[in-house]
Amino acid sequence: MDRKGFVTLPGQETVWSMAPGRTAAIKLLNEQTDQCVMAFEEVAPAGTATPLHLHHDSDEMMFVLSGEFSFKIGDELSTGGPGTCAFMPRDIPHAWKNSGTEVGRAFFMYAPGEAGKVFEEMRRMQRPAATMSDPEVALLFRRYGWEIVGPPPF
């Protein structure tokens, strides 16, 4: 790939509905960055939570833009609002939850971008994880180096 810089302006993102009220505005697709990084802004209704999971091939970063989020990274539990930044290294079980009472927004990055391809594939399939069976989700996640290791820990 001939690497070039580029700018994604508001409104130019690829927007995907992950679940009712939960959207991802994909700012950087994995293939646009020569697999270096994948980035998106997520809108998460109150109570939205991920299962305890890990990524074998990528590190994850989450920056809270609005709302209040709780994090479990390894054995540590934390909660923070706007300006909070969480780093979730590869092979460390982690999860997050919008623990506030309002819709929250967060910016995510995966580096390298391989782990983010799971979202790109679900978007192309038009099948959010919430509409898939547990074995389907596990197979898709495994394909991109993810592993679900437990339910949401909150």
Predicted region positions:
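A short, N-terminal "cap"/entry segment at the start of jelly-roll beta-barrel domains
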Residues: 1-37, 124, 128-154
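Short acidic-glycine-tyrosine-enriched beta hairpin
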Residues: 7-9, 15, 75-93
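Conserved hydrophobic/aromatic beta-strand scaffold that supports enzyme active sites
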Residues: 26, 39-43, 61, 77, ...
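Short histidine-centered beta-strand/loop micro-motifs
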Residues: 28-30, 50-56, 97-99
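Ligand-binding loop in jelly-roll beta-barrel domains
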Residues: 33, 70, 81, 90-116
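Short, conserved beta-strand element in jelly-roll/cupin
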Residues: 39-45, 54-73, 109-111
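A hydrophobic, small-residue-rich beta->alpha segment in the mid-to-C-terminal subdomain
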Residues: 105, 116-128
